[in-house]
């Protein structure tokens, strides 16, 4: 018997290998080197790996422009414009999250490289999901991402809430993973393959003899993804986990996890199951309505800002799903733009929440934000801009992101769905504006000024720049994601 070694295109794998390599290097150094790896060194390695990934992306984009999209490792990994954009967004998100975590770790007196080892490994899982062209590889990336996050959520062992959140996330996450892999097995039974390209080819050229298997498998896959993006009714873990996790980890969950999950969801529903559009659209229709309305409505009664942002994130996921529902190239580009611009804005928002939370990460009542913009105009003003961008206020990037997903939905015949989403945005405006006005309320005489470390200040500044600059001038990112969509899967 001849052993067939699959062709490996290492340029396609470089980002994933870099993150895995950096994580392993930090782990080995922590275990084998006598002098303890400092938090400065660990942050430096994380940022360096992310910058290397961004550099690789230029070479990957150039290769795709000249040779077209390609697959590698037995067609299980894809290199296309879509994956390049996803990799860059994840790499930038890792840099911003690492900088916030760096200052948080110093404040909480957390030494060593453990946090960054886990963050790098989890990010490698997200990259794997972005580039996956096979259901098994998506599951592998999902598990690598999830396992790292389970530990990160419970990283603050001094707080019982952190351990409780980790246990909840682990139990429900394991349940969702089991549902996903069972769905993959059913799709394999119906089509004879787990490769997304092969599934698409089979469904385009054959009559499905077992449609029940295919529909059941697709539904289970969708449930698995719905859990990861916190779509209603699979969102119940989100508020408790957001509240209990260390705040920098919450920022990772609101950004990097969404990028990986939505990238994989788009590949499965648009690339593999695109011919079954009329089958999965009604399910997604219901999910979007529930996600938009419940996310915005329940956020109204929240006094804890981390729980409020959890429900805000649920509402944002509903808008992102609109582009998926459209099932068109325009919808894919709109979702990609939304995710790419939402990530730095939400990380910057959680950076402010990390600062206001103070030592012990406990001060998360909205009352602690009263008069913040009066005491510290720069910090309060920055948070106001970030909140208005998530609201979708005109002249912010959030406005353009919401506009293009709604336009894609209406073009695909989803006027009623777009109307419900708009109504949910109107509801969400209440809690976003209430929080913003609270920042400028009469100052609390007992409140103290918030210390703003340099690296966290940079992260907040980047979020504000993205919110304003690309709100006024969205063209560069919009053009980039449109080109990436044209190069979506060979």
Annotate each PLM feature.
Residues 1-490:
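Alpha-helical transmembrane segments of multi-pass membrane proteins predominantly involved
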């Amino acid at each position: 018997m001849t052993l067939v070694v699959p062709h490996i295109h290492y340029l396609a794998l470089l980002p994933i290998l870099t993150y895995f390599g950096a994580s392993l290097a930090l782990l080995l150094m922590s275990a084998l080197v006598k002098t303890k790896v400092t938090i400065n060194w660990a942050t430096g390695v994380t940022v360096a790996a992310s910058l290397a990934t961004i550099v690789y992306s230029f070479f990957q984009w150039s290769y795709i422009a000249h040779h077209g999209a390609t697959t590698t490792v037995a067609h299980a990994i894809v290199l296309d414009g879509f994956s390049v954009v996803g990799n860059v967004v994840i790499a930038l998100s890792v840099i911003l999250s690492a900088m916030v975590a760096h200052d948080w770790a110093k404040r909480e007196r957390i030494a060593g490289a453990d946090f960054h080892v886990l963050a790098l490994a989890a990010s490698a899982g997200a990259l794997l999901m972005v580039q996956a062209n096979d259901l098994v590889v998506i599951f592998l990336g999902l598990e690598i991402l999830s396992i790292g996050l389970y530990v990160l959520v419970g990283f603050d062992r001094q707080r019982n809430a952190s351990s409780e959140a980790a246990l909840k996330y682990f139990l429900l996450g394991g349940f969702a993973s089991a549902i996903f892999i069972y769905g993959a097995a059913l799709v394999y039974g119906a089509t004879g393959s787990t490769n997304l390209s092969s599934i698409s080819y089979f469904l385009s050229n054959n009559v499905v003899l077992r449609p029940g298997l295919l529909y059941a498998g697709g539904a289970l896959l969708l449930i698995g993804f719905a859990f990861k993006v916190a779509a209603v009714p699979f969102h119940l873990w989100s508020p408790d986990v957001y509240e209990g996790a260390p705040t920098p980890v919450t920022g990772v969950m609101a950004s990097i996890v969404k990028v990986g999950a939505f990238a994989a969801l788009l590949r499965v529903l648009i690339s593999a199951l695109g011919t079954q559009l009329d089958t999965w659209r009604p399910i997604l229709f219901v999910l979007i309505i529930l996600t938009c309305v419940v996310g915005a409505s329940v956020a109204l009664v929240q006094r804890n800002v981390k729980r409020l942002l959890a429900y805000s994130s649920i509402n944002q996921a509903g808008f992102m799903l609109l582009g998926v529902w459209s099932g068109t190239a325009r919808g894919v580009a709109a979702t990609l733009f939304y995710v790419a611009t939402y990530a730095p804005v939400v990380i910057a928002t959680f950076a402010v929440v990390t600062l206001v939370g103070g030592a012990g990460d406990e001060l998360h009542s909205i009352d602690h934000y009263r008069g913040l913009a009066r005491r510290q105009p720069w910090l309060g003003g920055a948070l106001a801009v970030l909140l208005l961008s998530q609201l979708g206020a005109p002249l912010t990037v959030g406005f353009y992101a919401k506009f293009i997903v709604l336009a894609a939905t209406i073009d695909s015949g989803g006027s009623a769905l777009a109307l419900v989403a708009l109504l949910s945005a109107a509801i969400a405006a209440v809690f976003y504006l209430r929080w913003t006005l609270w920042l400028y309320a009469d100052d609390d005489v007992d409140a103290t000024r918030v210390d703003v470390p340099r690296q966290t200040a940079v992260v907040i500044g980047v979020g504000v720049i993205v919110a304003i600059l690309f709100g006024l001038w969205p063209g560069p990112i919009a053009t980039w994601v449109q080109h990436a969509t044209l190069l979506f899967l060979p």
